[in-house]
From Swiss-Prot:
This is Pseudouridine-5'-phosphate glycosidase 2. The gene is psuG2. Keywords: Glycosidase, Hydrolase, Lyase, Manganese, Metal-binding, Plasmid. One of its GO terms (molecular function) is pseudouridylate synthase activity. The keyword Membrane does not apply. Its cofactor is Mn(2+). Catalyzes the reversible cleavage of pseudouridine 5'-phosphate (PsiMP) to ribose 5-phosphate and uracil. Functions biologically in the cleavage direction, as part of a pseudouridine degradation pathway. It is an enzyme of class 4 (lyase). Substrate binds at K87, V107, S141, A142, D143. One of its GO terms (biological process) is nucleobase catabolic process. Its EC number is 4.2.1.70.
């Protein structure tokens, strides 16, 4: 079966055809993750970081019903300011296309579209996971199942402490997804460098990670890899402070009956309010840090992929 291909920007089409290093970027951080203009400034800043480290950024979104890989400045501006843009997971893409909607793509949708476009490395803030109480609610992010079926390396700062981190790591093991921590043995928890849990593996250079990616795919596993990159020490928030703040935000969400797709945007906004903007600053820095590592991995991986082909 011939699979659908997203529409590539000219720069993206040329880069992929040439085997140049490319890093995919999600768009829900623009449409639902941050307020304007911080969302646009962050998106442009992250793209700049990727270019400075030798790779080409590929921001991914649905634009008026069309799957798009590589966006122009005016398109990023529209995503950043428009109010009617939906949030699309992998399961939502077909309906968004039928309706001609514009959508910010979640981690799972971005992974899917990156894979269809032939992009191997993806930088994001954090991934979804297994929610606390999932044994009753079955609330498990599609990000985890997509990692188990899509050959994309996802560079992130771990998961937020609102999730059941132990069960998230167990679920990734079930999905045969290697969890590799960069420069540490600890699995990070987004705003903090340590979650109290260990990652499966530690690798200390982008070149090692790229080689692990190459060998992983040569084994025919068909799964992605999760690269856990701790937030820079200078930007990390105190664990007790942020854990208490997150607990307060979750309590507020429960009292207001907010759940499902609306939950994460609400929590991010509420946490930013409760921390007086400190969580937003940390979020921006960790995304840029992940983009930097992702670009270096993509640069190291590109010649390995060319040799394989």
């Amino acid at each position: 079966m011939t699979l659908m291909k997203p529409r590539l920007s000219r720069e993206m089409a040329e880069a992929i055809a040439a085997g140049s290093p490319v890093v995919a970027l999600e768009s829900t951080i623009i449409t639902h993750g941050m307020p304007y203009p911080a969302n646009l400034e962050t998106a442009l800043g992250v793209e700049t970081v990727i270019r400075e480290n030798g790779a080409i950024p590929a921001t991914i979104a649905v634009v008026k019903g069309e799957l798009r890989v590589g966006l122009e400045h005016d398109e990023l501006e529209e995503l950043a300011q428009s109010k009617g843009i939906v949030k699309a997971s992998g399961r939502d893409l077909a309906v968004a296309m039928i309706r001609g909607q514009s959508a910010g793509t979640t981690v799972s949708a971005t992974m899917l579209m990156a894979d269809l476009a032939g992009i191997d490395v993806f930088a994001t803030g954090g991934v979804g996971g297994v929610h606390r109480g999932a044994e009753q609610t079955f609330d498990i992010s599609a990000d985890l199942t997509e990692l188990g079926r899509t050959k994309t390396a996802v560079v992130c700062a771990g998961v937020k402490s609102i999730l059941d981190i132990a069960k998230t790591l167990e679920y990734l093991e079930t999905q045969r997804v290697p969890v590799i921590a960069y420069g540490t043995e600890d699995f990070p928890a987004f705003f903090t460098r340590r979650s109290g849990f260990k990652a499966d593996h530690r690798l200390d250079t982008p070149e090692e990670i790229a080689k692990a990616m190459w060998l992983h795919h040569q084994l025919g596993t068909g799964t992605g890899l999760l690269i856990a990159n701790p937030i820079p020490e200078a930007s990390a928030l105190a664990p007790d402070f942020i854990d208490g703040t997150i607990a307060d935000a979750v309590r507020d969400a429960d009292e207001r009956g907010i759940d499902r797709k609306e939950l994460t945007p609400f929590l991010l906004a509420r946490i930013n309010e409760l921390t007086k903007g400190e969580s937003l600053k940390a979020n921006i820095e960790l995304v840029k840090n992940n983009a930097r590592l992702a670009a270096r991995i993509a640069v190291a991986y590109a010649p390995l992929k060319k040799a394989r082909n």
